[in-house]
Amino acid sequence: LLSIFTLTAVAKAIYQKYAGFDETETTMLIETEMYKTHLLSDVTRYFSFFTDAGNFGSNMGFATILFGISAIFMKKRSIRIYYAIIAMCAIYALFISGTRGALFGPIGGIILLTFLSKNIKLMGATVFFGLFFYVFFAHTYIGESNTSIRRMRTAFRPTEDASYIVRKENQKKLAEYLKYKPFGEGLGLGGVEARKYGSRLTTLIPHDSFYVKTWMETGIVGLVLFLIIYVSALLRGCYLIMFRIKNNELRGILTAIACGIFGMMISAYGNAFFGQFPTGFIIILFLSVLINGEHIDQLLTEKLRTKK
């Protein structure tokens, strides 16, 4: 089901790229002032049928990792090919979304994969390709004529990115303002989109990050609680994958899920998409599958015994 959803999202984004935005999308871009962040001078950021390009790009990063890793562990050749095609389509969609932070989703997922695999050769290969990837974006100008590559490259050169510098300055202001507000300003009072609910510092500064938004609304207490819950669930899932799951195919799928969620959590630092639809639903659903992996493994084992 998710594979069909992903392919549909990619197809819609490609349609936007080559046929343009429809009347409803154009109206939304204008009325919500999304055109300021999506219709840039050097690149157009496509968002498919998602709420915005940040949400779309990050979900495509998740799909890249989920289907890319799953393709490695699937037994049937036809399914492996199908998943690999989806992963390639998703990474293409990530680039045309123009979401720089989403690029760190697949990178984070691959890093976690090396630890979960407990494979020295894979770790070595990951380090090699990671260095190659970093050098390509941070220290070369190869492909600079391509607007998508040029925009993604700025993520590896933050000191040259004006928006990054502004974000850091805004976070300094918020740190001073929220110093004596451990529970934050209140739900719904984070980011410029909340101006209609009240004028205060947290509604005058763009959050540009899900974690900053959570910090604004619920304070350091809420942010720490959120991270404890999600990190604990993810670590529990990683433990099950490494030491408890016996079915190889299931282990591969759960590894893909864990790596995808980890990548999304990293990507959420640069984009406030984590609580938006359908991301929030997808994350909770897959976390539930992940932490119930041992139970699923037992059911599969019983099913195989019954067949024998």
What is the predicted function of each stretch?
Residues 1-28, 34-42, 48-116, 238:
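Alpha-helical transmembrane segments of multi-pass inner-membrane proteins
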Residues 8-10, 89-93, 131-139, 261-269:
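Aromatic-anchored segments of alpha-helical transmembrane domains
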Residues 47-54, 182, 202-237, 262, ...:
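A conserved mid-to-late transmembrane alpha helix and its immediate loop/hinge
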Residues 29-30, 34, 40, 142-145, ...:
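Long extracytoplasmic/lumenal interhelical loops at the membrane interface
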Residues 25, 75-81, 121, 247-251, ...:
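Transmembrane signal-anchor hairpin modules in multi-pass inner-membrane enzymes, especially those
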